[in-house]
């Protein structure tokens, strides 16, 4: 049994109890009305009987006044008549149209049932509206979540694009710095090579001057010019480590530069030898052609 049927049964029981109580009250009111009518009729009959008795007493009194005056002693000695009270019968209540209590009860129950059904329908209608509102609210929530997810996706894509641009910019800057550093190293190498050539020129000029330095003295002189004093007494452990890394990087760069210069010197030496061989070969070929031209002139041998 559903909840609506239980509610209908409880409501019908309550309506039946109320209907029984109302019927009992109506019956009690009808009984009270009948008793009031009987009392009124009894009072009316008593009044009519009293009036008849008064009329009877007045009639003999008027006709025998002269006799009473003549015979006063006889009138006083006669007894008064006792009043006659007839048996009072309550009037019958007309039947009239009899009421069909079953029909009334049925109509009332139908009315109450219709009202209850209307209330139930209104309840379910309101509940249906609430469910529809709840469904629409859920749809709006889902739509809001989808929009938020889409916004989050767009934001993440934009963030990725921004990170990619930053990475590209960083790589470009690093390439630019590397290029500048390479150019700087190239300029340093060029300057160092120029210094070497200038050192050779100075050496030649010193030779021409008559004063000759040994290789050890040259090395000491160059090292004294290039070596800088290390001020590491006031440095902490981390700074000393950084300084050591810096010195190691400097030594590494110098070794790389030395290796490059050696390779360059070897390549130049090889090119010089190749050019010398080519020159000598060219001179040999040219000399052989000149010898042939001298031996044969105008179709005759000399």
UniProtKB/Swiss-Prot annotation:
GO biological process: cardiac muscle contraction; regulation of muscle contraction
Disulfide bonds listed in the record: none
InterPro entries per UniProt: TNNT (IPR027707), Troponin (IPR001978), Troponin_sf (IPR038077)
GO CC terms, sorted: troponin complex
Listed SUPFAM superfamilies: Troponin coil-coiled subunits
Signal peptide: none
GO molecular function annotations of the record: tropomyosin binding; troponin C binding; troponin I binding
Record-listed Phosphoserine modification sites: 2
Alphabetically ordered keywords of this record: Acetylation, Muscle protein, Phosphoprotein
Bias kind Acidic residues: ranges: 1-55
Pro residues composition bias: residue spans: 82-93
Residue numbers carrying N-acetylserine: 2
Basic and acidic residues composition-biased segments: 65-79, 138-186, 204-230
Region (Disordered): 1-99, 138-230, 280-302
Family (UniProt): Belongs to the troponin T family.
Functional description taken from the UniProt entry: Troponin T is the tropomyosin-binding subunit of troponin, the thin filament regulatory complex which confers calcium-sensitivity to striated muscle actomyosin ATPase activity.
Protein name in UniProt: Troponin T, cardiac muscle isoforms
């Amino acid at each position: 049994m559903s909840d609506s049927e239980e509610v209908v049964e409880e409501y019908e029981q309550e309506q039946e109890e109320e209907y029984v109580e109302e019927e009992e009250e109506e019956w009690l009111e009808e009984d009270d009305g009948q008793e009031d009518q009987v009392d009124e009729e009894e009072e009316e009959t008593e009044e009519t009987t009293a009036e008849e008795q008064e009329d009877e007493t007045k009639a003999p009194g008027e006709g025998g006044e002269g006799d009473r005056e003549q015979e006063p002693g006889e009138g006083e000695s006669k007894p008064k008549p006792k009043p006659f009270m007839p048996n009072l019968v309550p009037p019958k209540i007309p039947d009239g149209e009899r009421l069909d209590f079953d029909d009334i009860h049925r109509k009332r129950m139908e009315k109450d049932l219709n009202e209850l059904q209307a209330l139930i329908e209104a309840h379910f209608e309101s509940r249906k509206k609430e469910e529809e509102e709840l469904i629409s609210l859920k749809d709006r929530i889902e739509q809001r979540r989808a929009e938020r997810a889409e916004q989050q996706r767009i934001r993440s894509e934009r963030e990725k694009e921004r990170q990619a641009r930053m990475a590209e910019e960083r790589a470009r800057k690093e390439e630019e710095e590397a290029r500048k550093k390479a150019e700087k190293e190239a300029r340093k190498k060029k300057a160092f090579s120029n210094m070497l050539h200038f050192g050779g020129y100075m050496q030649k000029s010193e030779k021409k001057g008559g004063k000759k330095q040994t290789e050890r003295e040259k090395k000491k002189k160059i090292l004294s010019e290039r070596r800088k004093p290390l001020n590491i007494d006031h440095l902490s452990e981390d700074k000393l480590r950084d300084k050591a890394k810096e010195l190691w990087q400097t030594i590494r760069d110098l070794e790389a530069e030395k290796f490059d210069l050696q390779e360059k010197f070897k390549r130049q030496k090889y090119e010089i030898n190749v050019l010398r061989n080519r020159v000598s070969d060219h001179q040999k070929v040219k000399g052989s052609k000149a010898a042939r031209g001298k031996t044969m002139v105008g179709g005759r041998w000399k």
